[in-house]
Amino acid sequence: MKARSVVTLSDVAERAGVSLATASRVINGGTRAVSPHYRDRVLAAASDLGYTPNAHAQAMARGRSKMIGLVVHDIADPYFSAIAAGAISLAGSRGLLVLGNTLHNPDYEFEYVSTMRAQRAQALILVGSRTTDVEHTRRLTDEVAEFIEGGGRVAAVSQDTLGADTVLPENRAGAHALAAALITEGHRRFAVLGGPKTLLTARDRVEGFQDALAEQGLEPPVVIEGAFTRDGGYTAMCGLLDLPDHPPCVFAVNDVMAIGAMAAVRERGLRVPGDVAVAGFDDIPTLRDVAPTLTTVRLPLAEMGRLAASMVLDDEPRTTPRVAPIAGEVVLRESTIR
């Protein structure tokens, strides 16, 4: 059987009886108007022939493509995937193509922004964690500035140092409120599974928790660093349980670390919360399957993604970046009941 040939824009123009330039203006959205009569003829011809538009040609004709680049550190992490889902739900409703993601690799982050700029993407949404790496932040800020100068829109979640619109969770205040709630519940000795010191999100949560204990005249928590992952929480908790007379109430700075920490407690033949109370942060969707139910600080993750998407999709002119603070809500559950 003879292979079907690829339908070109020239084929569409010939079928419609118009010039190639006219067909291009209809299909690719050029700046010059086309009369309804010829527009209908071109669209009918394209439909009859099964023509698929060239996305790059459309971007060149319009000055911007319909793409939104979605840069996510780890799409497998429920925190990032929930935010991404919110962004995608809004962008998809606008008929826009949303692309993902990076893999915790700063070099991929730069390459992704650069590629989206070269592809004339309409917008970028950056969903990542702030870092203490000054050089990384400088390079990413420069890439973002070039993207914006080229006419693109950028919004970030958590990263408030990039010169872009930002959805900013109040990590320090949320951890402070959690500590205060746990103290009210009768807890007095604490440990914190703190995540890497290079992540400012983790650092803010640790410091907010520490501040609340200090305000109540309690001993500083034992802080153990670990990867910002389930396995990081598991390993950090194992280290804590090896300490003599370890604190009986543990705050893991995100929920996936808390889930790993609870697994470590169970493996030692101990009970949550009977022997060790555990709390997390974020209220990721998968917590509905965790037993006992996990005390945490709830962030509206999907709404944060939608808000970031709305920031890059609106047409309001502005000269300074906007910052939308997002408050956390303490949710007390079974894992910290005394």
Where are these regions (language model features)?
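Short beta-strand segments enriched in small/hydrophobic residues
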Residues: 22-24, 62-74, 181, 189-195
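Amphipathic helical "hinge" segments at domain boundaries
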Residues: 36-40, 49-123, 130, 207-210
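N-terminal helix-turn-helix DNA-binding module of bacterial transcription factors
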Residues: 1-66
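Short histidine/acidic/glycine/proline-rich micro-motifs that form metal-
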Residues: 28-29, 74, 103-104, 130-134, ...
